[in-house]
Design a protein with these regions (language model features):
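S-adenosyl-L-methionine
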Residues: 1-71, 79-87
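SAM cofactor-binding core of SAM-dependent methyltransferases
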Residues: 68-128
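Conserved nucleotide-cofactor-binding alpha/beta core module
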Residues: 102-105, 160-161, 185
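A short acidic, Gly/Pro-enriched loop at the edge of an enzyme's catalytic core
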Residues: 131-141, 146
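Glycine/threonine-rich flexible loop motifs
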Residues: 152-164
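Conserved class I S-adenosyl-L-methionine
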Residues: 154-156, 188-193
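A short glycine-rich, Lys/Arg-flanked "PGG" loop and its adjoining helix->strand segment in the class I
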Residues: 164-181
Length: 193
């Protein structure tokens, strides 16, 4: 490694965040409201909407935090989105949404080792992350690159029920895109079925 990375970690904060994440991800918290869940992160959330304040997130690392927001859904290990962060022809901030925690860990490792400061990684089901944390008409572009095809289980009437691109999620994606034809949804797949 030719580049050194300076990370400051506040261990009590990390411990609290990991504990909160475990509670949320394993379903132990059933009666708390979204606002109660987000209390440890108040400076990064809008008090009126409970949506993430991406300007605040990105301004912690960069002088110009007002670049457009672009999102990749189902980012896997993060290769594509990290390459975009480095080489995008126009400056942008990126949000990566991934369901699997092992892949999220790989993305965060690549961010830290690569000095990436225009990427925010979110773990969770894409529709829930977009609905709960991303404001309406706030996203320049949503990318879905080569998603896993929907799997139909025996007895399922709706084969798209567990897929990230089910109708409900497509509606949420549409609401998150900039208005007046400025928002784009780019879907790339090699699956013909």
């Amino acid at each position: 490694i030719h580049k050194s990375v300076n990370l400051t970690i506040n261990l009590p904060d990390v411990k609290d965040q990991l504990f909160t994440s475990l509670i949320d991800n394993f379903g132990f918290r059933t009666s708390s409201s979204t606002a109660q869940t987000l209390n440890p992160y108040d400076p990064l959330f809008d008090a009126n909407t409970n949506k993430l304040k991406f300007g605040e997130i990105f301004s912690q690392n960069r002088k110009d935090s007002l670049h457009p927001l672009r999102i990749e859904i189902g980012s896997g290990n993060g290769d594509w989105v990290i390459n975009q962060c480095r080489s995008s022809p126009s400056p942008a901030n990126f949000l990566s949404i991934e369901l699997r925690s092992d892949r999220i860990a790989k993305q965060i490792e690549k961010m830290a080792l690569g000095g990436i400061d225009n990427l925010c990684v979110a773990g969770g089901e894409c529709g829930k992350v977009l609905r709960d944390f991303v404001g309406e008409k706030s996203v320049e572009c949503v990318y879905v690159n080569f998603p896993e095809p929907p799997q139909q289980r025996s007895g399922d009437k709706d084969e798209s029920a567990g897929h990230m691109l089910k109708n409900e999620n497509l509606e949420i994606i549409g609401r998150s895109l900039l208005g007046d034809g400025r928002g784009r949804f780019i879907f790339v797949s090699d699956n013909l079925s």
